[in-house]
Regions:
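PAPS-dependent sulfotransferase catalytic domain
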Residues: 1-153, 158, 226, 230-241
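The conserved 3'-phosphoadenosine-5'-phosphosulfate
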Residues: 30-51, 74, 151-222, 226, ...
Length: 243
């Protein structure tokens, strides 16, 4: 079994992946980083959080090998579903979760993250977001990915804001989805470690920064906010973020 932890960029996907991964590890699953090493998947599962990238046949079939050999592990992605990915999900070989956020806050966070990366001289996935329009188009692409995952009935859908404000309830939903027992003593320290108030911004792979709901209202000017409302409006209403 492969647990596929998918997330909108800058929507707590690193936080959610590590929570999911550590819950599974505490329940007897395999360490994905060891799977990556043992099965020579360094070119498939990249970065600290074992990101598979696009769900292409080559990548999916590569990670399917250790799964079919009896290994249970968690991988991360930001990409949308594909025909083969959807087939494997329907067959129960992949169990997907998807976390998303108010795209206005996610867009702001991506722009700021890219700016910090450029200032450090260390390009990252957001370095190209050098202006408002580029960031807007970037987020529109990920809203289409959000739409595709919301159509996946087998996926567990989670809002980042709900993780921040009702962590226990959202963790219970995740545990139920994974088939784990909350009363398992091994899981208690994991759940505690990832509480929003306990999360450390410097924790490797967590990518936890401001974590403030509605921060775009104070950081973007009125014209920019109106553009976001006009562009994202149809999505915002369906996502539950319509003012």
């Amino acid at each position: 079994m492969i647990i596929l932890s998918v997330g909108m960029p800058r929507a707590g996907s690193g936080w959610y992946y590590n929570l999911t991964n550590d819950l599974m590890l505490a329940s007897g699953a395999q360490d994905t980083r060891q799977i990556r090493q043992r099965y020579h998947l360094q070119g498939i599962l990249t970065e600290v959080n074992c990101n598979i990238g696009a769900l292409t046949p080559r990548r999916l079939l590569a990670v399917l090998v250790p799964s079919l050999m009896g290994n249970v592990f968690v991988i991360k992605a930001h990409a949308g579903p594909t025909p083969l990915g959807s087939f494997l999900i329907r067959r129960g070989l992949i169990q997907p979760t998807y976390i998303f956020r108010d795209p206005r806050d996610a867009m702001l966070s991506a722009m700021e993250n890219g700016q910090r990366a450029r200032q450090r001289g260390q390009p990252n996935a957001f370095s190209h977001l050098t202006d408002f329009d580029r960031a807007l188009n970037f987020m529109l692409a990920h809203l289409r990915i959000w739409e595709a995952w919301m159509m996946c009935q087998e996926a567990l859908h989670t809002r980042y804001e709900d993780m921040l404000t009702d962590y226990d309830a959202e963790t219970d939903r995740l545990l139920a989805f994974l088939g784990l027992d909350r009363d398992n003593a091994e899981l208690i320290p994991v759940i505690s470690n990832y509480r929003p108030e306990n999360a450390r911004p410097d924790q490797k792979g967590l990518h936890f920064s401001q974590g403030v709901i509605g921060r775009f209202r104070n950081k973007m000017d009125l014209e920019q906010q109106e553009t976001l409302e006009r562009t994202f409006g149809p999505y915002l209403e369906r996502m539950g973020y319509k003012d």
